Amino acid sequence: PPRSTLFPYTTLFRSLVYDSRKVTKDCMFVCIKGAAYDSHDHTEEIARAGAKVIVAERPVKVPEGVTLVLVEDSRYALSMLSAAYFDHPAQKLKVIGITGTKGKTTTTFMVKGILEHAGYKVGLIGTIETIIGDTHIPSSNTTPESYLVQKYFAQMVEAGCQICVMEVSSQGLMMHRTAGIPFEIGIFTNLAPDHIGPNEHASFEEYAACKGM
């Protein structure tokens, strides 16, 4: 795993947050550099809003009494922290990951249906929705941010699910949203020259490399 540096305080935190609009008192906040907003540039404001621990990829300003954790990759750190925060729920499930250029959604629902017919209780995370028991949550991304993935795993465990079938996008892999998940089975549907562009992958080679993670 990437190296990390902790200084200068050890602090208990109440919640894990990565969205600066959702900072809560005494939380651990993970700075993420996005396409249009980089929370590394707003750490003093985030600390004033209540964060007691700030995780960042580069040295940032924090007030006295706030713990700063420096990591090589904050998205990777968020994934590992989220798993720990929710008590590693994926270890209590059989997780099946499905990736590929085309067919992920169809395959995910097919596998879910087959397993349910065999008597298993199955959760699903995918492009259309996340399904946890009788609860259906509309999706914003094929593979949600790692914090949400782990939160959904925890809710599946609580709901009595034995298996989770999830779509795994190349963007999700590239951004470490699935880092640390102990996949029981991986299914690769196909690979085609798609998702190439300034907001996705720079080249087909990069796209293929992400699919192979």
Show the residue positions of the predicted features.
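Pocket-edge positions in alpha/beta enzyme catalytic cores
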Residues: 4, 69-70, 141, 199
